[in-house]
């Protein structure tokens, strides 16, 4: 279950999108996570509360004392004045913005930087399919492709793994792609590794066995699976190198793992 198509830059300027839509960022120190979507952090000698969009467990990343990047969110009606944007782990900046991969892929599609999808001139986002939505529908005349994008932040021995918590929603998205492929429609999923490290990708069967099974089934019926390692810095995320995709962590060659 290995795929490879290259980054498709061909000398072009790198595809980049800003963190948090370009909002000013401030540094803080992680203190606690009282609930799934709430983080408490020390900033300038005071405790602040920040919204966290990532549904994952993030136990490897959100450790006491971890350096965070927060964006100020002063909109009326918000319960928190800040948004968690990213966290440093061993010097590697990891984006925790789950919508950033979609913005990055949208930019890459518009610039033709993903050659496997370059033939489609029309790009629709957040397309309703029955009770569910798919991230992108690409089309060129009657030729269409359904494309789902997933955010990856966790590493195990240098291998990017997904999910970080059981994801029924992710499983439903795979079912949409599986059904499309069975009906003769092109379908693909792109895993965006939101950090500069991660030399390969694999589903984490220990976290969500059902998702891992669905991903194997998707591959078997023709759903295309890609993964890109996308470096993050305080100014943005860059579409980086495509990395190999494996059916499971156990299938990753030992020499690719970092101990």
Swiss-Prot record:
A Pfam match: SfsA_N
Coiled coil: none
InterPro entries: SfsA, SfsA_C, SfsA_N
Domain of life of the source: Bacteria
GO MF entry, a single one: DNA binding
Transmembrane intervals: none
Entries under Gene3D superfamilies matching the protein: 2.40.50.580, 3.40.1350.60
NCBIfam families (UniProt xref): sfsA
Assigned protein family: Belongs to the SfsA family.
PANTHER family membership: SUGAR FERMENTATION STIMULATION PROTEIN A
Name assigned to this protein: Sugar fermentation stimulation protein homolog
């Amino acid at each position: 279950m290995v795929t490879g198509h290259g980054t498709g830059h061909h000398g072009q300027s790198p595809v980049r999108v800003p963190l948090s839509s370009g909002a000013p960022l401030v540094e803080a120190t992680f203190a606690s996570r009282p609930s799934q979507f709430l983080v408490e952090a020390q900033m300038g000698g005071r405790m602040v509360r920040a919204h966290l969009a990532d549904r994952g467990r993030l136990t490897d990343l959100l450790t006491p004392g971890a350096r965070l990047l927060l964006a100020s969110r002063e909109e009326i009606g918000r319960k928190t004045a800040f948004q968690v944007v990213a966290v440093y782990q061993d010097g590697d900046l990891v984006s925790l913005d789950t919508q950033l991969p979609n913005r990055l892929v949208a930019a890459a599609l518009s610039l033709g930087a993903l050659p496997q999808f370059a033939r489609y001139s029309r790009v629709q986002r957040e397309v309703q399919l029955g009770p569910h939505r798919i991230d992108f529908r690409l089309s060129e005349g009657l030729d269409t492709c359904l494309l789902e994008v997933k955010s990856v932040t966790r590493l195990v021995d240098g291998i990017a793994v997904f999910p970080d918590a059981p994801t029924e929603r992710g499983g439903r998205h795979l079912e949409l792609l599986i059904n499309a492929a069975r009906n003769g429609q092109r379908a693909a999923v792109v895993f965006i590794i939101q950090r500069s490290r991660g030399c390969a990708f694999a589903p984490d069967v220990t976290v969500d066995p059902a998702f891992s099974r669905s991903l194997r089934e998707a591959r078997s019926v023709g759903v295309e699976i890609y993964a890109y390692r996308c470096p993050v810095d305080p100014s943005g995320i860059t579409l980086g190198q495509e990395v190999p995709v494996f059916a499971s962590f156990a299938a990753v060659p030992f020499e690719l793992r970092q101990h």
